[in-house]
């Protein structure tokens, strides 16, 4: 029997306060997160942003106990998935590969090779594909394949996105139903989906399918929820966690909460749709920041649906995904990294603002001038970024 390695890919998170700065640096040093015309600017800019944001982020992590629970939860998901797959007759071993903190992807790959695995199923713990999540993780795995001959020879099957998988949809609907039933008038409870946002340019310019997959997923979950409850609930969708002055996909979570309060909503059932594990966005942003906002807006009951974590229906759904991947047509890593015709991965292609090499040279000079202006404002404490509250 072939030995199967199941590689669970996730974001990662700082486990201690002193990890916050390095964790943020790793995020902003990723060209899938911040795209620059000159690669030489990536690490200096990542250092600046992580330095500026560390204090605020450290406060958020202190509010949830001093660190992220993401690694602990993901490793528990891996253990339970491994156990279930073995019960189903699959000789599987699960591995955790975090993108921006320990255990890094390199560590998981080293363990896979040391264990003599025969083939690998790559399962991103992001139900909805985005350039900045699954895309970045696939690209990192590609990079390791290119530099490691023994790993390159290992057969790999990839699961790209699974927002419409019946097991995932059912698990979400079951957890939502539990909270809806607690409402004073369950049929009137407002089901409010909050997804992590992405810059609007990702969707409109790069062709990122994330927003379409989120919207389609919401529709599927609401249909399943109605099957479970026997009645339909009003629902809405918004996007959270935006940073910086760039426009992100809308509507924004904070604005919709205020609108719902003004409209007289009493019972709000909040669904963290793009998060399969509890972490900073659910425990701090939703549970603390947005709960307070909802109270101020006049919403009486704020019930947050727990993240899937190791919910049995969810783990069964993950096992079904792995089984289907092993039985179905192979989707290799290169195919997984080319989800749509317009999706661009960076630095896979050069980020061109000009029509010729002279234009690109000027682009780089302009970027350097902008970077110098940013440094000057950082040192002086005055400028447009301070005026808009970014610094």
UniProtKB/Swiss-Prot annotation:
Keywords, alphabetical: Cytoplasm, Heme biosynthesis, Iron, Lyase, Metal-binding, Porphyrin biosynthesis
Residues that, per the record, bind Fe cation: 196, 281
CDD domains associated with the record: Ferrochelatase_C, Ferrochelatase_N
Listed EC numbers: 4.98.1.1
One GO cellular component term noted in the UniProt record for this chain: cytoplasm
InterPro entries: Ferrochelatase (IPR001015), Ferrochelatase_AS (IPR019772), Ferrochelatase_C (IPR033644), Ferrochelatase_N (IPR033659)
Organism: Prochlorococcus marinus (strain MIT 9303)
Gene responsible for this protein: hemH
SUPFAM superfamilies: Chelatase (SSF53800), Chlorophyll a-b binding protein (SSF103511)
Enzyme class: lyase
Subcellular location: Cytoplasm
PROSITE patterns linked: FERROCHELATASE
Full protein name: Ferrochelatase
Protein family: Belongs to the ferrochelatase family.
GO BP, one annotated term: heme biosynthetic process
Gene Ontology MF terms: ferrochelatase activity; metal ion binding
Pathway noted in the entry: Porphyrin-containing compound metabolism; protoheme biosynthesis; protoheme from protoporphyrin-IX: step 1/1
Catalytic activity line of the entry: heme b + 2 H(+) = protoporphyrin IX + Fe(2+)
Role noted for this protein: Catalyzes the ferrous insertion into protoporphyrin IX.
